Each structure stands twice: as structure tokens, then as C-alpha cells.
Amino acid sequence: MHDFVSHILRQYFHATNWNEYNSYLHLTSCSSAILDFCVPTGLSLSISASPTPPFFTTYRLGALPNLRAGIGYIYASTDSKIDFGGSSKDVRLKEIIERFRIVEARAPAAFKSKEKEKEYYWLAGDRYPEQEALGDLGKKERGGGEYLVYGCMHVPSARLDALWTKRISPTWQLIVTAVSSPPRYPLNALQNAAIASRSAYSTGAKSTSSSMDRLDSSNPSLSSSTSLSNTGASTAATTAAAAAAAAAAQDTYGLGPPGSTNLQFTLQRDTGRWFTEYSYSIDDALWGFRVLHNFGTPADTASTTLAALSEGAVETSSSASYPQRNGSVLHTGSSSSSEDTEAGGGLRGRFSAGAEVFISTVEKSAGLSTGIRFSTLPDTPQQPLMIAPSFDSSPSPHQASTLASAPSQPPTVITATLNPMMGHLSTAYAARMARDVVVCSRFDFNVYSYESEWTMGAEYWLRKSGGGGGVESVEASDADVPAPMNRIGSTSSIGGLRGHDETRQARFQEEHAMSLREASEAVSQVDGNTGDGGTSVFGLLRDPPALAPSAPSPRATCANSTLSHLLSPITGVLKARISSTSDIRLLWQGRLSHCLVSLGVKADLSGTHGASYSVGGAPASPKMGIVKSIGLEVMYFSQAEDESVE
């Protein structure tokens, strides 16, 4: 689970339209989310808040195994508001939990007429005017000027972490990070060690000078010929004595290593098909370069259609206010048949290849790695469907089967990385086998030592049994489901708005661009189905006359159960991994009350219980058991209430 700082940083990238997953650094993020998840150690508590929209505070406390704490502050300046979920109670779990996902790289959209080709150009997936018109725009319209500042102080180590990122242009971004660690000893120990070192240095210098005087007085004929060599010898002896005295003082007074400060600059450029990254670290003079190239245009299949749907969202929302009913399904997309886009066997996707190079001028060392990735493309929605509000008591089996229909191909990501200097080769395969089940396997091999490791893991999303309506059900639905299916679930479960405050009602209507007429019809539909005879939530339409209850048909019951399971809210995720080295990890992440909880355990099957015995028969130190660590992490965050909302 992402901590609050990482969550805010990712939402900042989303608010500024920056795709961080297009970097070579995230080439294997899909498999790492399933196989390399972190298990919390000990007990930790995190409390965060947002007093004002651009300002965030976070406090972290760890009780076990050692007492530690940290306090941090975040300030962001963006054109659009950062939507971090509001609170830990309302945030979508799939936004804050590190999970398997397929993120499309931004690409130039192909839906533009020939008459407007001279007026606009496409850059990083966004449309901009020509250079003549671009010069008249301000800095905000150009995409620059947005920044984020973060600082955190850790206790008791007094380590300071800082981050500053600034959006230079629509395709350029600068990130500066700093880590400062103070010396690990108190001031009184430092003063005592300095006095001891000074006295040892003076004593060594006096003894060296006295020995040289005795040598000169005993043999004056050699004094003139060996003056230069004696001077060098005395200097070396003095330096060695001072170093030995300093080392002895450090051991005597318990002095630790001196403090250090590392400052790193990272410059990133994203054009959709190309992502380049330049970095420099001051501490060890480490230069780095990363590059990732996406073969083919991401807009070949799904992205173009999704871009067209996003451009026509205004027309869709306006037409949705006065729908033309065709049974209970509205066709808002194009009327092209699905037979035109059907392909043969195999997976349809796109390849991405990249590499990274690091060179340290101080340590005279270098590093190199390269990798390739294949990811499937999402389905192209040919006919987006939206259930129109009606007074039917239950959805038809056709609608339920449409909701529960699986994609034409399972979302799959295949990666392969190679480190030629270390001889390390790694291949990974991750796929979504069901709506809530993702499996992944990875094989690591070293060509020099012939050592290998096989790792397998899975994640399973838990849902509330019986289903739950309301906004939480809609917000907790699968984010990977195409937009039409999300629109279906949102409209069919709008009746669950009853009992929520007006703020959620307004937010729900704004997100789905629905008119009050549709909302009132949907609420009246629920009231008519329940037969409670109460008034509507919005109070815009009269309640329909109560109908005599009738026994539901088996087909309607099956459809209702399918729809209820589809709209059931997510309560958590269960992750597990096992490797050939007997390393086992189990992690549960979910929401309890208003808090986000992570509970994990790490075990090693090669460990044995009991004490081991030495050669003489005396018992030695006992070995660690199978369970290596158990951890619990609780996170809570909220924001100040908006007083402008009545």
C-alpha cells in the first residue's frame, strides 16, 4: 500500500497529466506489485490531513521493533485540484494499493479533420495551437509552472528528506531530491574526542622532533644531506600518529560515521512514444540515463476510440439528459459492427523496449541494464451501453450477461530484463485470470554462477458478500473495466444514493453528467421496486403506484445475483508469493472502519525451531523459526470540510 506521501505524489502527476508509468523505471512494475510487495515490520501508525487543498501534513509513528517517528509537509501548486480521495474512508482502494495495472502511454490522437491540421498540433497526447498562437498563451496554458514541495524529518535519527518537482513544459519535468544524515554522536562526545585527538597529535609531534634533534647532534655530518628525507619522514610519522590517535578516540568515545548529504537531479521528457530520463547524484558523482520506446502508436486500437469518446463527452452527456429509449439500453457509440474489428488468435498488444546506464566518476564503476515488455491493449468499445432508467423491477438477463462479460483477451504483461555486467537475466509473466484474480510468475537466472530462482504470486480482490449499493459500490468497482461498463454500474445503482448527504449526490451527478430528471426517475424506480410508499429523495416526481408483488422468475433472480456481485464493493486485497528459496509472504490490505490497514507475515521454510549445538556439546544461539517477521500498519487521513458546500 502506498503511503500518504507517495499517494499525493501520484495524484499530483495525475493532476498535471504526467504518466510516470511510461518510464523505464516502471518497466516491471506489474510483476513487482505482485511478487515484490513490502510486508510491514512491527507496528506503525500514520495520520495525515489536508487543512487546505494545496497543503498536506503527515505524521508517522513506529512502535516496534524500535521507537521511531517522522513528520512531513507537502505543498502543491497545480492548475487543477489534486483529488486524493478526500479521506481514508472514501478513497478507492485500487488507487492507493499498489496493484497490477496496464497503463497506456499517451499518444497523438488521430481524430482531427484535415481542415484543422494546420491550426493544431498534437504533443504528448494533448492538442495545442500552432507556434504562432502558442506564443500568446501564458505559462499555465503552456503546461508549466506547476510544482510540488515535500519535506520530512525523522526522529530520532534526525534524517531529513526533501523533494521538489516542477513541470517545466508539457513534455519536460524536473525532480530534485535530497537526503541529509547528521553525524551519529552527541556534542559532548564530539568535544571530548576533539580534545583527545589534539593532545595525541601534539604528543606525537613533540616525540618526533626530540628524536630528530638527538639524531642531528650525534651525527652532524649527515644532517645536511638527509634534511629533506628527515622532513618527509617526520611528516609521515606525524600524520600516522594523528590518524591512529583519531581512530583510538573514535573507538574510545563511541563516535559514529560523519554526516552526509546526497543531492540528486532528475530531468524527464515524455513524448508518448519516447521517455528519456537524465539524472546526476552529487554524493558519488553518479551520472544516469534511462530511455524507453513504445513501438507502434498507442492510438492504433483502443486509445483512439477512448480519445474520441472523451472528446465527445459533452455531446454524450447532453444527449443523456433526454435519452431515446430502446428497450432499456441506450446506444451512445458508433453503429459499426464488432465483426469489423475481430482479429485472429493470439494476443493483441504493443512492445516496449528500454535501457539504463549509470557511470560513477568517483568510484570508477558503471552499470547497464536493458529490458523489453509486451502488454496487451484494452478492448475497443464499439457500442458504449448505458442502462436507461425505467420502471422495470429487475434488469434483463441480457443486461446482466453484458455486465459480466469478460474481455476478448486477458490483460497480460510479459517482461524480460538483462544485466550484462552482472549476468542476471529475469523474465516475468503476469495476467488477469478473472475479474478479481491476477497471477504472476518470474524466473531469475545468473549466467555466471548458474544460480536460479523461481517465484510465483497472486493477488485476489475481496468483495462484500451480498453486494452493497450506493456511491461506495460504484467507486469501489474495478478501475480496469471499460468506461461503458462503469457507466452501466453507475446508472443502475444510483438508487443507493438514498441516505447519503447532498455533497455526494452533487459529486455523483457531476462525474456522470446526469440530469435531475434521470436521477429522479432512478430513485422513483427504486422506491417503486421496494414498495415502501415513501417520497423520492429529490422530490421531483410523484411516486409510482404500488404494484402487486409477483414472484421473480429464475432468469430475473440470476440476473439480479450477477448484477449484485458485479456492483459489490471491494473490501480489500489478499497477496501471496512463494519462491524456490523457501521465501513466503502473505499480505492483506483493506479498510476497517475509517482506516486503511495492512497486515502481513514473512516466513522462511528453511528455518528450523530449537537450539543448535556446537562441537563441544554446549548449546549455541537458537536459530530463528519459520516466521521471520509480522507487521501491522494503520493509516488514516482526511481533509477539512468545504464550507462553501451547503
UniProtKB/Swiss-Prot annotation:
The ranges of region (Disordered) come to 206-230, 315-347
Give TM regions: none
Name of this protein: Mitochondrial distribution and morphology protein 10
Q: Give the principal location in a single coarse category.
A: mitochondrion
Localization per Swiss-Prot or TrEMBL = Mitochondrion outer membrane
Gene Ontology BP term (one) = protein insertion into mitochondrial outer membrane
Q: What is known of its domains?
A: Lacks alpha-helical transmembrane segments, suggesting that it resides in the membrane via beta-sheet conformations similar to those predicted for other outer membrane proteins and porin.
